[in-house]
Amino acid sequence: MQEMSGLDLIDLLGERHFGLRRIAEELWNERGDVAISNSEWFVMTRIGSGEPTIAEVSRQVDITRQATHKLIRKMLEKGLVAVSDDERNRKVKRVRLTELGYKCYENNEELKAELEARIAEAIGTDKVAALKAILAMDWGLKNRET
């Protein structure tokens, strides 16, 4: 891993996030039957067990509606999501995880728990708990956070 001692907070967080996502994606692709990109995982996490509109997903992942539609089309082809008309407004499309999508989502949650356990083994459970608490705090940046 690249030398990180000279990095500021923003870059440290970014490097760790990128590294963990890469490891998680590699582990999933070694174990899973369906190749799923980080972008697809990000969308699947936003969908979860709900049925948001495609516009809501687009706002949550902070990408254009066009890019969201393209990503969801790829996920449809893989059988990870299903799209349906909203009951009240047929112009509005809702997206949900399919049985396969939800199974992948659940298996990925287990994989992330394994990674967290490995991190705790390396740095200690107390430090992992402290890190999670710090990351969950209100950092006073509400005007830019989502």
Language model: regions and residue ranges:
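N-terminal leader segment of winged-helix/HTH proteins
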Residues: 1-34
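N-terminal positioning helix adjacent to the helix-turn-helix/winged-helix DNA-binding module
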Residues: 5, 39-40, 100
